[in-house]
Amino acid sequence: MKVKNTIAATSFAAAGLAALAVAVSPPAAAGDLVGPGCAEYAAANPTGPASVQGMSQDPVAVAASNNPELTTLTAALSGQLNPQVNLVDTLNSGQYTVFAPTNAAFSKLPASTIDELKTNSSLLTSILTYHVVAGQTSPANVVGTRQTLQGASVTVTGQGNSLKVGNADVVCGGVSTANATVYMIDSVLMPPA
C-alpha cells in the first residue's frame, strides 16, 4: 500500500512538473512559426512590442495594436472604424485562435465595402468574429474545420509554410500572445450568407 501511494505521489508530482514546464514554455521563436512572411516580419521587428517576443507579452488586441501589419484590423476591432463595434475586451479576456487579416488584406476590399462597414455594425461584427475561434491552436494542430465565434465554420488546409484559411494564405502564423495564437492572413474572410 505504501509503495502504491509513493508511486502515485511520484506520478502526480511528475505530471505537475510537466504541466509547469508547458505553462512556462517560452513563446514561439521566429523559427517555430509558419508562413512565407515570418522571417521577413521577424527581421523587420526584431525587438520591442511588435516583435514575436514582444507580442507574446500582451493580450491579443494589444499585441495586434503594436503590430504594424495589423493597423486596419485594430481600427476595426477597437471602434475606430465603426464606433458601435468594439471587441477589444472580448478578445483580451478569453483564449482564442485569431486569423488576422493584414493591412494588405483589407486593401483588397472594395472601397464601398469599407464604407458599409463604417455604418453597418452587425456586418462588421459578423466579419470580425468569423476570424476568431475559441481556444488556442498551434500550427501542428490548426488544420481542420473549426467553428468561429460568428457561428459558421472555417476550414484550414495545407501544411508548414503553405497553410490556407478558407481562400486566404497564411502570411505568418503561430504567433503567441498572452491569450491567443495569431495567424496573419492575406485576405479578409467573408462569412457565408
UniProtKB/Swiss-Prot annotation:
Domain FAS1: 57-189
Localization per Swiss-Prot or TrEMBL: Secreted
Disulfide bonds: none
MF GO annotations: cell adhesion molecule binding
Main subcellular location of this protein, as a coarse class: secreted
Keywords in alphabetical order: Secreted, Signal
Entry keyword annotation includes Secreted: yes
A single GO BP: extracellular matrix organization
Signal peptide (residue range): 1-30
UniProt keyword Protein biosynthesis, yes or no: no
Subunit composition and interactions: Generally found as a monomer; homodimer in culture fluids.
Record PANTHER family: FI19380P1, PERIOSTIN-RELATED
Protein name per UniProt: Immunogenic protein MPT70
Origin species: Mycobacterium tuberculosis (strain ATCC 25618 / H37Rv)
Taxonomic placement: Bacteria, Bacillati, Actinomycetota, Actinomycetes, Mycobacteriales
Name of the coding gene: mpt70
